[in-house]
């Protein structure tokens, strides 16, 4: 099957014209325009952070960091050595990028550009001396050798770990770049050592006179937000931030507060919502009292004005690597998270209050920053793809965390099977897949899809999942494609476009945009607007990479679309696969509760692992069901093998072939072998001899040899190895010599198989 699979995918030797729109369009011009000082490459964790940094580079503001450490920062920037800055919220560490860049480049003429999924590289890119990129774009530039040893890398918010960022750190070390890194309050020891920092500047806006009152309360969030607490909020006109671990929890908290106290301004924000919904809170125009519920991840880069009270749920969901799998697990918050969230009011505002909802006895005053938690160990495939793009071994990269060697080898074998990697390097097919701005499975579908399927694949490639696209209470009537979460999600987007959308431009690039009516539509359907906007961004970037015009309208997916899509999936199968709730490795996987797929049959999609109530890993899947006839159509038949099956009542020697489909065995075809064909005679005698040595074969002489075999082995043990050995291999070889000339199972059963002790142990011994 291995050879068959790789051959199938390597047939795609002339894929559609695909261009990586995020790389400099003219590499020679980009290299020639490199300033003598090198460029300053700023690596940001998110697209929003790119915009913040771009604005910050154009500002000249007085900050705590500049007042207390400005001269030291300028001296270090001019020295040519790497260094770090660890600074709390409100100190102005991002604003320090401008003076650092001016010092490094020996000019105040900063020509700043941004490259992320919204803003691709342009012919003007070579003229930029400060380039702000997200982690994924930085990794692509490293793979294309566009970042050089003369460049300085400034990593903003380095504490926001991700597999892409950690890979970029290793790639920058390989190139020999200088690192300047900016972090919130974490233990900087690891980064200082790993990145070879000459020093670490630590700064804080903490004012002891403004230390907050901190209380540990063992209550659930909804119980804590009771009438007594809300009356105090209203009376004192407080600005409250409630930090919770899940989107559903955030929405429930906001709904509960609004229902109990409508006179308190209430809102929520998480990764599924556009930032504009809380713009008044960020600009300081929202009147107190207010309660703003946010996910811990959603709030990390936001500066909420007027905040004087925070409520922190001591719970987080994070991925823990177990046997190469990312298992979503429920844990308590770490010190870094608690300090960062509490630090929004602790030591910053008069009368600040911090409530930590926890079943632990937390001594807040004793909390100290800890080292960051890294993510790279769970993304071996990304490491393998990057190494193949560079033509290097994973051993050549000084990764911040040890690589899971077993998981890495499996990932590399998969990429080789799929024709993406060959001899440690990307194939033509692999380069086409890597050039697309989507995850590898979706990129493979786009490379292999006919033009009429491209709109469907392009849209869904930008949607995390149907589950993450919708709220718990949703109305998808008329949009569901039975058996396909993928196409149902597509239909949700298609309806949003048809009812509320139009084709506009963002940063001069065509993209589907949506008018204000999308909010009402999304509320009625139970859809997250942010997921629609993200899908629009993803679709636009895919179409630009494919060199195709963005369609103004989209057809709805119907039954004929499902058949075409299922055919494409069955032919290429780039996703995880579950058949009858079983995974390839024999594990159990349930269909997700929000899926529109049935429980049985084959489902292609994304497996997600989560910890059950007792901590054991469990798996769920959503995706698209593949009919059995398509599974059979694209299944492969293995070459027949001669095997001895001792469990069969009759005809234990058989020719067996397997019908397999992407790691699943669908059927076995068995043909009894009684007479040995000349081409198989030697192999048949060898297999029967081994079966006899294991005492599995039905042969009258085998039991008669027990005493002799035991005597020979005992003599070998007593002599310390001086007498000949009679282990399994030696016994099988002895039997095989005695089977010379045997050409049928019947002759085997009647053959004389003997073990003569005198041949191994001299009679006198």
Residue positions per predicted region:
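P-loop NTPase motor module signature
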Residues: 1-445, 605, 609
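N-terminal intrinsically disordered, low-complexity tails enriched in polar/charged
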Residues: 1-10, 67-68, 478-487, 763-765
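Intrinsic-disorder/low-complexity coil detector
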Residues: 23-24, 34-35, 207, 220, ...
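C-terminal accessory domains/tails appended to large, multi-domain proteins
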Residues: 47-48, 55, 67, 71, ...
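Solvent-exposed, charged interface segments at domain starts and junctions
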Residues: 73, 134, 229-230, 239-241, ...
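Residue-level detector of short coil/turn "hinge" positions at structural boundaries
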Residues: 309, 422-423, 550, 723, ...
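Second RecA-like catalytic domain
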Residues: 316, 364-664
């Amino acid at each position: 099957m291995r050879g068959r699979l790789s051959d199938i995918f390597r047939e795609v030797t002339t894929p559609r014209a695909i261009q990586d729109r995020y790389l400099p369009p003219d590499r020679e011009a980009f290299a020639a325009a490199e300033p003598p000082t090198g460029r300053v490459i700023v690596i940001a964790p998110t697209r929003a952070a790119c915009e913040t940094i771009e604005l910050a580079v154009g500002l000249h503001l007085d900050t705590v960091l500049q007042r207390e450490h400005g001269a030291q920062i300028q001296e270090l920037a001019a020295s040519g050595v790497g260094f770090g800055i660890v600074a709390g919220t409100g100190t102005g560490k991002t604003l320090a990028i401008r003076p650092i860049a001016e010092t490094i480049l020996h000019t105040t003429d900063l020509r700043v550009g941004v490259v992320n999924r919204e803003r691709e590289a342009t012919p003007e890119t070579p003229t930029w001396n400060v380039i702000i990129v997200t982690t994924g774009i930085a990794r692509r530039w490293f793979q294309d050798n566009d970042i050089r040893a003369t460049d300085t890398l400034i990593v903003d918010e380095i504490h926001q770990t991700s597999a892409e960022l950690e890979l970029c750190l290793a790639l920058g070390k390989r190139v020999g770049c200088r690192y300047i890194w900016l972090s919130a309050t974490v233990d900087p020891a690891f980064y200082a050592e790993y990145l070879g920092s000459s020093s670490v500047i630590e700064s804080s806006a903490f004012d002891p006179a403004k230390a907050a009152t901190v209380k540990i309360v063992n209550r659930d969030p909804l119980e804590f937000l009771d009438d007594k607490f809300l009356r105090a909020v209203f009376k004192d006109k407080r600005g409250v931030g409630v930090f919770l671990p899940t989107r559903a929890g955030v929405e429930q908290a906001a709904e509960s507060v609004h229902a109990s106290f409508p006179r308190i301004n209430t809102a929520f924000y998480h990764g599924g919502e556009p930032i504009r919904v809380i713009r008044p809170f960020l600009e300081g125009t929202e009147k107190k009292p207010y309660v703003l519920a946010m996910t811990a991840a959603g709030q990390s880069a936001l500066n909420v004005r007027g905040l004087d009270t925070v409520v922190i749920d001591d719970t987080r969901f994070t991925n823990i690597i177990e046997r190469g799998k990312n298992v979503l697990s429920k844990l308590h918050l770490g010190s870094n998270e608690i300090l960062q969230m509490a630090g929004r009011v602790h030591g910053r505002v008069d009368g600040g209050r911090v409530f930590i909802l926890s079943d632990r006895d937390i001594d807040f005053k004793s909390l100290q920053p800890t080292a960051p938690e890294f993510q790279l160990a769970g993304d071996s495939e990304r490491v393998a793809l990057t190494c193949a793009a560079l033509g290097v071994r994973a051993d050549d990269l000084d990764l911040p965390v040890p690589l899971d060697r077993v998981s890495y080898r499996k990932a590399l074998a998969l990429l080789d099977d799929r024709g993406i990697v060959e001899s440690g390097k990307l194939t033509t097919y692999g380069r086409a897949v890597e050039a697309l701005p989507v995850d590898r499975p979706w990129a493979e579908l786009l490379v292999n899809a006919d033009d009429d399927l491209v709109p469907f694949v392009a849209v869904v490639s930008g949607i995390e999942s149907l589950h993450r696209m919708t709220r718990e209470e949703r109305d998808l009537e008329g949009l569901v494609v039975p058996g396909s979460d993928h196409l149902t999600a597509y239909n949700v987007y298609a309806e949003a476009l048809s009812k509320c959308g139009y084709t506009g431009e963002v940063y001069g690039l065509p993209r589907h945009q949506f008018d204000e009516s999308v909010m009402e539509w999304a509320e009625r359907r139970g859809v997250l607007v942010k997921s629609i906007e993200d899908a629009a961004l993803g679709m636009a970037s895919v179409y630009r990479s494919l060199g195709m015009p963005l369609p103004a309208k989209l057809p709805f997916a119907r039954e004929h679309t499902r058949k075409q899509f299922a055919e494409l999936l069955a032919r290429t199968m780039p996703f995880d696969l579950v058949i009858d709730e079983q995974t390839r490795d024999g594990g159990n996987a349930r269909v997700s509760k929000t899926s529109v797929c049935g429980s049985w049959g084959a489902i292609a999609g994304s497996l997600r692992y989560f910890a059950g109530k007792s901590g054991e890993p469990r798996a769920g899947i959503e995706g698209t069901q593949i009919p059995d006839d398509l599974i059979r159509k694209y299944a492969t038949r293995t070459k027949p093998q001669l095997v001895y099956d001792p469990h069969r009542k009759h005809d234990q020697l058989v020719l067996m072939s397997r019908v397999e489909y992407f790691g699943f065995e669908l059927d076995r075809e068995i043909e009894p072998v009684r007479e040995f064909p000349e081409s198989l005679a030697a192999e048949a005698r060898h297999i029967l001899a081994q079966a006899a040595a294991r005492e599995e074969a039905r042969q009258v002489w085998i039991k008669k040899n027990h005493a002799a075999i035991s005597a020979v082995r005992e003599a070998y043990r007593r002599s310390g190895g001086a007498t000949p050995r009679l282990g399994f291999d030696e016994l099988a070889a002895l039997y095989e010599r005695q089977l010379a000339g045997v050409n049928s199972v019947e002759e085997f059963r009647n053959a004389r198989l003997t073990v003569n002790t005198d041949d191994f142990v001299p009679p006198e011994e």
